């Protein structure tokens, strides 16, 4: 064998370049539920999701959530970074309000495009956390919208498919 001196090996960082872009067929697929056996993989997946989100925030100035399929991980998992990190495994939405609100939505898979969509004002999110413990979270407003956006990704639905009408698109500088 031989020894290489003064060599620094950098672990590769996940960046915006790793995020699947609009048109990638994987973004339109239904994701599979995680099994308990896959729980040990979640830590690395979340690290990758966090790094991608941080890069988007740095370059584009937005990003509160990212879904596993956006990195080609076809599992029912998303990651939110709000007041603290939230790891959301096998989520289910219940009790969506009949009250809706309209907003301009953005997405890491097409960071320069805004899409006008209607979302439920409130909902309840049931999910498993990183310890495989059941959680229930009643949310409204901006957090409700964010959860609906990320949940859609797990079902192969993009906000472009929920546009309010055919004029509900605009470019973001």
Where are these regions (language model features)?
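Positively charged
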Residues: 8-173
